[in-house]
């Protein structure tokens, strides 16, 4: 083909440049590759010859360029082949990466299972309170400067099981609290106060509590070289360094030094724990010391006195006369404390009002502007315990008098109409049903200790003894003992879970009362949302509980293996828990240990609550004070020992929602004390990632995790129904859940009554605990 035969495609008007632009390769001169070459083609504006094409600074004849087309097409073909080859290689690498990621995930799950087993096994040698071994260099909260930030797995998933902790139950409610004060110089008191105010946890205490804490600390001195704290020993004292220098070490490795003004050991005043580091005096040192029992007495006494005082004030208000003690108690919880200087108008006549006030200390003057008089007339003076503004809670908003604070000032407790409405509902409609007061009083009159056999199915186990029970496999281990899969009288077609608790461990941790409470509460319950207790046994080494078995395994294990749950899955498991909590709360029982580890999956895929070691039955309107629970789940009022009730379970429910959707609890750090500090900062300080948990679920969490227990969703007049009505549950089939017709999101694979594949594998237990003969378990 001649050059003249292709004028339209190769020559005329620079068309060759346009055609060649589809190809590649540079014939020298222009450089920059095929596209670079053709991008430079242009018709010279000063050349009359239309068959010439300029490339950069060079000019070519069109027929010369046409000769290059076959070469360019061949080059393009070679490049295409190379690209296809490279693409095949890349696709192979991508496939291999995907396979390796799957293998890594599988290995990670196996590592998680082994880690869970090892950590639970290690609990046997852990602290009396059941705290896990220290995961990273820290000093058992021996000094704030040595505390570290949370260290989470890269994917944000918490892979280790969470360990519950507990102090010994206190009985300060039933006996007067006698506190001994120790003399100190003004400088010593100021030094202790300054140290307390610098401590993230202790500075959260009320002013009165800090004053009492300072007064009750006693002096201790140690010489250079003396051990103040030794790793592994039980701890029950807090220290403030007054003079000298100490060093902190773990397993012989130096962690740091502490000097005057440092607080150490604050975790030990909350609950039973062993020291995870040693502290040795480098010089002669002076310390101020506070015992755990004294700290608990200080915090509990103030909380009890304040709550009792408020209850006394509120029961005297005429419009509250017919409210139950439980509702008045909730009102006391949500009242705010305010202070007004002398001369300040707390209320002005004629203005709209929506708050009720109780005078906590000081005086107020009541004046009223009478028509025809130039000056307001003084009506009366109100003192401590008096109240005013109660009609505003009924909607009568216009104030009819002035209320003026008297010098030097007045402290008042306030309740606004909105909070009152949420707690009580419409007062007029409430007056139509005062039966709750009588019903609740009946609950209080019931003796708390006798066990009720509520179901006929327990009768068939009346003659069963420990000799009739055969162990088949291990379902779980911990510092308390083990849980075994068992059958009775050799019948493997019907299996059970046998929980064996070490009596010596129970006595060492002073948990006898909790163990009996667990037995009594579980014997009184009969619902599909709670694991059934059939029978209890005891011998010289253990107390035993024969329980309903749930072979679907722990919800925590499923969560660990999946990483996190979507909205639909989480909603189902939250709804199951809510049904169980409602049942318990109707019986005035607070659960206090909600977490995925204590939620078991039945063969049907439905969830049941287990482990009632921290559950407690309360009298109506009353609180309990023992520090117990799982660090990541405890509420602020438990940490600060303000007294707690069922509202603590609503806080835990919010944390539970977060963990199911995020794969880890929202409050989490490298040590419990740091975790408690995060909790006390509040849920509003959290940055909850929205890629896994949406705005609606986040809103529910924040309503459940209010700092004030009385403000939490579920604590109001609507109770649990207020939670069910939240937008996150919109469209949820509650009737289907209760009738068990709603399909569960996950159906466990269980092949037979002895199938334990949904549980981790545990090694045999060769540790034989010593005998325990104190007799505390008589009647168990």
UniProtKB/Swiss-Prot annotation:
3',5'-cyclic GMP 2 binds at residues 380, 389-392, 399-400, 434. It comes from the Eukaryota. Residues 61-127 form a coiled coil. Its cofactor is Mg(2+). A motif (Nuclear localization signal) lies at residues 492-504. Its EC number is 2.7.11.12. 3',5'-cyclic GMP 1 binds at residues 265-268, 275-276. The keyword Transferase applies. SUPFAM superfamilies: cAMP-binding domain-like, Protein kinase-like (PK-like). Binding of cGMP results in enzyme activation. Residues 1-55, 119-143, 757-780 are annotated as: Disordered. Keywords: ATP-binding, cGMP, cGMP-binding, Chemotaxis, Coiled coil, Cytoplasm, Developmental protein, Kinase, Magnesium, Metal-binding, Nucleotide-binding, Nucleus, Repeat, Serine/threonine-protein kinase, Transferase. Its main location: cytoplasm. GO terms for molecular function: ATP binding; cGMP binding; cGMP-dependent protein kinase activity; metal ion binding; protein serine kinase activity. It catalyses: L-seryl-[protein] + ATP = O-phospho-L-seryl-[protein] + ADP + H(+); L-threonyl-[protein] + ATP = O-phospho-L-threonyl-[protein] + ADP + H(+). Signal peptide: none annotated. Changing residue 362 to R: Loss of body size, reduced locomotion in the presence of food, a pale intestine, increased intestinal fat storage, and a decreased propensity to form dauer larvae. Residues 9-35 have a biased composition (Gly residues). It is an enzyme of class 2 (transferase). Belongs to the protein kinase superfamily. AGC Ser/Thr protein kinase family. cGMP subfamily. Promotes chemoreceptor gene expression in response to increased cGMP levels by antagonizing the gene repression functions of the class II HDAC hda-4 and the mef-2 transcription factor. Regulates gene expression via recruitment of a histone deacetylase complex containing hda-2, saeg-1 and saeg-2. Represses body size and lifespan through the dbl-1 and insulin pathways, respectively. May also signal through daf-3 and/or daf-5. Role in egg-laying, dauer formation and motility. Regulates behavioral responses to various chemosensory stimuli in sensory neurons. This is cGMP-dependent protein kinase egl-4. It comes from Caenorhabditis elegans. The gene is egl-4.
């Amino acid at each position: 083909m001649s050059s003249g035969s292709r004028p339209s495609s190769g020559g005329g008007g620079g068309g060759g440049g346009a055609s060649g632009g589809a190809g590649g390769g540079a014939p020298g001169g222009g450089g920059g590759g095929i596209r670079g070459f053709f991008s430079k083609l242009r018709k010279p504006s000063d050349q009359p010859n239309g068959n010439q094409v300029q490339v950069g600074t060079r000019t070519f004849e069109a027929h010369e360029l046409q000769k290059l087309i076959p070469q360019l097409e061949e080059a393009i073909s070679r490049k295409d082949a190379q690209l296809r080859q490279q693409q095949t290689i890349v696709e192979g690498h991508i496939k291999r990466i995907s396979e390796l990621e799957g293998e890594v995930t599988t290995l990670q799950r196996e590592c998680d299972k082994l880690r869970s087993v090892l950590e639970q096994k290690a609990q046997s040698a852990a602290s009396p309170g059941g705290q896990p071994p220290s995961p990273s260099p820290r000093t058992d909260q021996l000094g704030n400067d040595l505390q570290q930030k949370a260290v989470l797995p890269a994917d944000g998933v918490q892979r280790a099981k969470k360990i519950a902790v507990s102090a010994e139950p206190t009985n300060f409610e039933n006996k007067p609290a006698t506190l001994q004060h120790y003399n100190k110089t003004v400088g010593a008191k100021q030094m202790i106060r300054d140290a307390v105010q610098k401590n993230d946890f202790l500075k959260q205490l009320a002013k009165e509590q800090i004053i009492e804490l300072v007064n009750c600390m006693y002096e201790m001195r140690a010489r250079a070289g003396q051990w103040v704290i030794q790793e592994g020993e039980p701890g029950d004292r807090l220290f403030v360094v007054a003079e000298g220098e100490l060093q902190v070490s773990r397993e012989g490795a130096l962690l740091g030094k502490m000097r005057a003004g440092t607080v150490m050991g604050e975790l030990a005043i909350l609950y039973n724990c062993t020291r995870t580091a040693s502290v040795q005096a480098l010089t002669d040192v002076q310390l101020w010391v506070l015992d755990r029992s004294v700290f608990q007495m200080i915090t509990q006494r103030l909380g009890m006195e304040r709550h009792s005082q408020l209850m006394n004030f509120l029961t005297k208000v005429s419009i509250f006369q017919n409210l139950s003690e439980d509702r008045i108690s909730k009102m006391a919880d949500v009242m705010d404390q305010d202070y007004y200087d002398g001369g300040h108008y707390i209320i002005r006549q004629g203005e709209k009002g929506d708050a009720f006030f109780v005078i906590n200390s000081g005086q107020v003057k009541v004046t009223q502007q009478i028509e025809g008089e130039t000056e307001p007339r003084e009506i009366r003076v109100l003192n401590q315990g008096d109240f005013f503004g109660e009609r505003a809670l009924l909607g009568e908003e216009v104030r009819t008098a002035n209320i003026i604070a008297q010098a030097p000032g007045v402290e008042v407790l306030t309740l606004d109409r909105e909070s009152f409405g949420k707690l009580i509902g419409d007062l007029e409609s409430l007056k139509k049903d005062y039966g709750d007061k009588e019903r609740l009083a009946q609950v209080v009159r019931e003796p708390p200790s006798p066990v009720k056999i509520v179901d006929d199915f327990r009768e068939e186990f009346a003659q069963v003894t420990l000799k009739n029970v055969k162990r088949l496999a291990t379902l779980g281990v911990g510092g308390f003992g083990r849980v075994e899969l068992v059958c009775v009288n050799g019948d493997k077609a019907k299996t059970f879970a046998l929980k064996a608790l070490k009596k010596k461990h129970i006595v060492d941790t002073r948990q006898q009362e909790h163990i009996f409470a667990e037995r009594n509460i579980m014997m009184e319950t009969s619902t599909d949302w709670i694991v059934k207790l059939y029978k209890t046994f005891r011998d010289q080494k253990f107390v035993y509980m024969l329980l309903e078995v749930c072979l679907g395994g722990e919800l925590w294990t499923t969560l660990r293996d999946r990483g996190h749950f979507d909205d639909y899955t989480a909603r189902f498991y939250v709804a199951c828990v809510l049904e169980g909590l409602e049942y318990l709360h109707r019986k005035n029982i607070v659960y206090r240990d909600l977490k995925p580890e204590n939620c078991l999956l039945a063969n049907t895929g439905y969830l049941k609550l287990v482990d009632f070691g921290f559950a407690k039955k309360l009298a109506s309107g009353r609180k309990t004070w023992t520090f117990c629970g799982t660090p990541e789940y405890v509420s602020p009022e438990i940490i600060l020992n303000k007294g707690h009730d069922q509202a603590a379970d609503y806080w835990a429910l919010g944390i539970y929602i977060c963990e199911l959707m995020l794969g880890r609890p929202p409050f989490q750090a490298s040590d419990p004390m740091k975790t408690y500090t995060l909790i006390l900062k509040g849920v509003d300080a959290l940055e909850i990632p929205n890629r896994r948990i949406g705005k609606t679920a986040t809103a529910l969490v924040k309503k459940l995790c209010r700092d004030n227990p009385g403000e939490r969703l579920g604590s109001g007049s609507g109770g649990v129904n207020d939670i069910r009505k939240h937008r996150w549950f919109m469209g949820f089939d509650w009737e289907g859940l209760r009738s068990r017709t709603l399909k569960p999101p996950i159906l466990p694979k269980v092949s037979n009554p002895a199938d334990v594949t949904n549980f981790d594998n545990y090694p045999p237990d060769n540790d034989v605990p010593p005998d325990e003969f104190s007799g505390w378990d008589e009647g168990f």
